[in-house]
Every structure is written in C-alpha cells, then in structure tokens.
Amino acid sequence: MTRRKSKRLALPALAVMIAAAVAVPAFAQTAPRSTTLRAVGEVTFKANRYVKDSLRFNRDTVTIRKGGTLTISDITKQPHSFSLVKKGQIPRTMRQMENCFGKGPCDDLAVAHGAINPDTGEEQDPTTPLVNVGPAGFNQPGDSVLIPPSGKVKVKITGSSDKYYLCAIHPWMLGKVKVGR
C-alpha cells in the first residue's frame, strides 16, 4: 500500500473515531432514579492492645437524579445518621473530625434530632428521627435522618446541586451526593 493511499484510508477512520467520541456522551446514561448507600464495617477491641473502628459508608460518592430516592441501610448493627452539611464542614483531619462535636455540626444535628437536651447539654434518646430544615426533601445542610441499627431509611434528593453528607454520630463516615439529570 502506498503512503498516499494509507493517508486516504486513515482520514475517514479518524473522522469516524472523532464522531463516535462526540456521540457517545450524548447517549450517555442519565443518573439513576434510585440507589442505595450502606453503612458497613465493624468495631473491634483487644484488651490492652487496640480499638479498631472501620465503620464507613460503602461509597465515597453517590450519583442520583434530582428527585430520586436514596436508600440508606445499615449492616453494622450501630445507629447512624445521614446528615447534609456544608462542604467546609466535612472533616479532612483528625482535629476537624473531633471538632464536629461541641460547637460543630455534629452537636447541632444531635440537638435538632433531640439527642441532646439544649438546656442541659445532656444526651438522651432522640425524639426527632427526621430533620428537614427547608423545603420538603433532602436539599440543604441541616437535613438529616437517623438510621436505626440494622435498619434502613429512604430519602428523596430534591436539590439540584451536589450535596455533602456525614454521619453525625461517626463523622469519619462521610461523602458526596452527586446530583445528575
């Protein structure tokens, strides 16, 4: 095959590859209408040696369509929360994680759930399993739901922008909800 002929054959092949690269995103799958996030891991203890806590959510990022249903389930047999917070409230260091309590968002969420008496500061059984601070659905920081041990809950993601979440009981359990279309 001559050099000229191979160039003539390469040009249409290149055009087909470029067209395919442009067309594939146009046909890309939209975000799902429903998905599940799981609390997984365990706490282990060995006397005079260690306490190891591997509790976490099974995904760092969850993608879901606006108006979609997110199911949060627990297999750890521990209580958890799924709480929306501002991006800047997501802890990235041990100190930030510890500061979630006290004057941080974890205590604010505990008070909102009725798990801390705001007058005395004492812990108590939560009285409000679902906290919705704005319009109906999960759409802004402060929206929060409690997940009972071995239980599951469903929430509707109604906001259109990405959300950041953590467990107000175990603030190292955290992630992002990517809201798609």
Language-model segments: which ranges?
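Hydrophobic alpha-helical segments, principally membrane-spanning helices and signal/leader peptides
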Residues: L9-A10, V51
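Residue-level detector of intrinsically disordered/flexible regions characterized by low predicted structural confidence
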Residues: K7-L9, T35
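Extracytoplasmic copper-binding redox domains, predominantly the cupredoxin/blue-copper superfamily
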Residues: T2, A23-R181
